[in-house]
């Protein structure tokens, strides 16, 4: 064979070696992008990467779903044994259980009664449940000033019972914001479909056929009747949770909180117990992940299921399996003090007892409705319909039925 014939073979061999080297480099880059996977089913699993990520973090953001409360006896929504499936079987529904959580549920009396029965049951389960190890872990992070924010999709109010995880309803429009941001509302509170009325949840409100009329709306109509004015449509009471195809009453506040948290440069994101199906939650996770990676921090996924393709490339650490088991094993490694449940019952003063509108529990506050500004104690009284009624009654001469004083009405802001 001539020398000229050897040259193409040598060149082809070199080309193949270069391609092989490039492919190996690409494979290495791909592997470096894949998250580290830990399975709680393996008793010998090394949790040191998870411990290291949490220890070095100073500003942790946590996004949670129903999976963190299953161990407390509260069902999730989408699993085969979840709330949607059980509702369909219990009430023999032709529709999916998800449709009971749609904003159109109040258009049909039968759907309303089923929805209210489900709400009473869910509130009872939540009220009797105890926070899980993961809830206590979140409280510990807050007490150690490592938790920047907790965004929860849960309505069971287990988080807000614990120290450091307080929230308020409605959310304020400007800082300071509470540690816990309920993305879907809470079963601790009922609200009016028309006015700004808020009250602590009472199961008796939903233990009847149909709906319960808002007391503030009834009082307002009584004032208007005495003043010789036309009556207005009265709202009804409902749990202050966000249903599918509804506008979130605190959407602007949540957007402001997210913007502020991104500016605070979080260095760790923990996504726990959620499949991330809600578009708004997806956006929060993606934006927070990008911000965390800019700070050279870690994005941690804790769930039975592995992350979807949308989130797989965002995660640095995937802990797949029972997240309660993971936290129990993590606890001694972090050298955390004993995590004790703070007493949910607190002594109330006579002033607090006289006003359920001021405070629901030791951890969840009811604040003034969004958009109402009060300049003084006198002006805040004038916004109260009961005070207006008192004014009107005092302005009536007996026996002459004559109104001497024109009554002004503060238009309540819709939720």
From Swiss-Prot:
This is NAD-dependent protein deacetylase hst4. InterPro entries: DHS-like_NAD/FAD-binding_dom, NAD-dep_sirtuin_deacylases, Sirtuin, Sirtuin_cat_small_dom_sf, Ssirtuin_cat_dom. It comes from Schizosaccharomyces pombe (strain 972 / ATCC 24843). Zn(2+) binds at residues 192, 195, 214, 217. It is an enzyme of class 2 (transferase). The lineage of its organism: Eukaryota, Fungi, Dikarya, Ascomycota, Taphrinomycotina. GO terms for cellular component: chromatin; chromosome, subtelomeric region; mating-type region heterochromatin; nucleolus; nucleus; pericentric heterochromatin; rDNA heterochromatin. One of its GO terms (molecular function) is histone H3K56 deacetylase activity, NAD-dependent. It comes from the Eukaryota. It catalyses: N(6)-acetyl-L-lysyl-[protein] + NAD(+) + H2O = 2''-O-acetyl-ADP-D-ribose + nicotinamide + L-lysyl-[protein].
